Amino acid sequence: MFNFDFYNPTHIVFGKDRLDKLDTLVPKDAKVLITYGGGSAVRSGLIDRIVKALGNRKVEQFGGIEPNPSLETCERAVAFIKERGVDFVLAVGGGSVVDATKLIVMGATYDGPVIEVMKAGVPEVPVEMVPNPLPFGTVMTLPATGSEMNNGAVITYGDGKFPVFSSLVFPKFSMLDPTLTFTLPEKQVKNGIIDTFVHTTEQYLTYPVEGRIQDRFSEGILKTMIEIGKETVENPENYDIRANHMWASTLALNGLIGAGVPQDWATHLIGHELTAAYHLDHGITLAIVLPALLEVKKADKLEKLAQYATRVWHITEGTNEEKADKAIAKTREFFESLGVSTHLKDYGLGEEAVDKIVKQLEDHGMTKLGEKGDVTPEVAREILTRAL
């Protein structure tokens, strides 16, 4: 196991009927900005309920944060905050709203252009650059990204998606109420299942380093998502199923399962380029890329793939290579069973998409991806070709 530091200060408030706790979690004298996405949070009455729970605090609202949030939207929110004197932000929605809010709270206390903060986001925005971002909390309505309990964001600018990290943008608290997910469109639920699943495989399907606890955590999340995947789509108001989905999504990317073990992330980074170029949903791009990547990188990941086959899919017969092949096939079948196609051609994309994405990877400096830095543009081309 590798050396690691694990730090996560986010207070999780889990379960139904918890909005009244906002009155104790948000400072009494705060001037609050509620950030949210489309109109569903307003139409459902959730925003009104949150405003009521905030009591006598001054509350402003900033809506319209889009899926795959753009730098331009974040810039408008920062200008709004500086104009109105906001000092606490409450993100209401899914990962896109929370990701945008992380950049917004940094930009709100930075003297220069917000784009400078975004471009300083890897490996991490320097503390001296933004030493005091505004505090923020979240009320989650979509289980998927894990952004409610981590310090990362992904922002869209031009034809690229930019990761942004800072040790100072963990949410102060996150409210996870499974009942707030009951009215989600089916497509978003499917995407959330796949996102949670692939967040986990990115930190698990690499190579062994005797991270036994981390492996068991990951296997538990994967097995749970396989067990509940179809049911959480088909029975949206099953509280216990949605509760497990929501908690699994948070645990998949709060730093715990990746502590002390190698991490891949090539599937996500290639997927980000597909989203930026063709506006495919993030979950769809992961379903396309992961099985193809596992096929191409099978030899390098063989030991963990065989372990995955045995422990997660209960495949016990055959050589390690045979087990790996069966596990990869099972993974593809799982995504397809949710009604999510796993080939580029299913979305009207062919060889020209392969060329475009490889060029974007090169243009954005994504030339040494994967846990060993050996997913070069040539390997990415092989993966995308396999995904056709």
Which ranges hold each PLM region?
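Short glycine/serine/threonine-rich phosphate/pyrophosphate-binding segments
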Residues: 19-22, 42-46, 71-72, 96-101, ...
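Short Gly/Thr/Asp-enriched flexible loops that form oxyanion-binding sites at enzyme active sites
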Residues: 77-78, 97-111, 149-150
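Glycine/serine-rich anion-binding loops at beta->alpha junctions
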Residues: 86-102, 141-147, 277-280
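Active-site segments that bind and position negatively charged phosphate/pyrophosphate groups
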Residues: 203, 207-330
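ATP/NTP phosphate-donor binding region
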Residues: 1-88, 344-345
